[in-house]
Amino acid sequence: MSDPMLDPITMRADWAEPDGVLANYVSLTDQLVEHVDPGTPFTLTVGGLVVDGELIPQWQWFAELSELNDHEDAYYVGMAEYVKELSDLAHTAVKKRDIGEEISFRQYQALSVPTRYIHLRDARISRPGQATGVTGRLWRGRLRDVSGWTPGRADA
């Protein structure tokens, strides 16, 4: 009988999952209900690129994106409102759960949504050996594509 941890299929499946610690940190950030300013500084390695910026909640990222064009893009405005509602539901559910109260089905669903993306403000994207990259952007990336990370900005 072979060791399941050495099975190539099991090993590939593990690599398809995002880093659990980073996913948990992002998930907790996404449940915040107040604007974050400044965000938590992070540096990520994604596909050979270095991406650094301030981690902000998903709903805030969509809200700031909609502000870039004076709320003229209904899609981003709608997404900001929808994601903010999910964040509010999850935040309320955590508070109720912590004091032993029952939560609604919608609150349970909001808590159960897996965190799949990370959202950065004032992001800078650069290649190894490049002095500076493109800065000041809102950046959204898949958590499972992050191969490494550290708290703080790359230039700090």
For each predicted feature, which ranges?
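Conserved RNA-binding domains used in RNP assembly and mRNA/RNA metabolism
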Residues: S2-A156
